[in-house]
Amino acid sequence: MQFQYSPYILPLLACAVIAGFVAVYGWQRRATVNGAAYLALLALACGEWSLGYALEIAGADLPTKVFWGKSQYIGICTVPILWVIFASAHATPGAGITRRNLVQLSIVPFITLLLAFTTELHGLIWSSVQILNVGTFSALNVTHGLWFWVYLIYSYILLGAGTFFILDSLNRRKGLFRRQNIILLLAVLIAWVGNLLYVLGL
């Protein structure tokens, strides 16, 4: 693998580090704070996604960028599931998820992850890949295949469901919990906008 420095990786690395601290913070409080364990796992997934994108940008050749572009799908495929589980647990204390429900939620992401790492064989995630250079910025420029759009819709459904859980809890929570939910909603809104800009190629 070949890498080169790019200033664009610094915010992504900062996000990965912050996500790591959030993961540790949440995991240490998993026994006393409702949903803390899911928050820790969600933060880890977000951190992996950010780190993968940073390494994709820093990659100096196509194979390196492709490898780290694919690696991001570990986070891409787990963030929506973990978000809806965390939102449910956070919004409704005592709520849990059964193993059967977890398996059902994981089917599409698992298929997506397999397709991402084998996309050269079928083009269902990326039908074409090249390097995009804009000034000092360098990243993958991909044409998305059919399954990418299938998973995009699925992930938006999960993100929307989790957002609904948080919104619904605003009517039932007050004080600190209400402020926490508002912060969560703002964070999700930023994530939605960022993802839409990526999908639209902006």
Predicted features and spans:
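Interfacial "cap-and-anchor" motif at the non-cytosolic start of specific transmembrane alpha-helices
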Residues: 5, 9, 36, 40-41, ...
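Hydrophobic alpha-helical transmembrane segments
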Residues: 25-28, 113-118, 195-202
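Individual alpha-helical transmembrane segments in multi-pass integral membrane proteins
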Residues: 2-20, 30-132, 143-160, 188
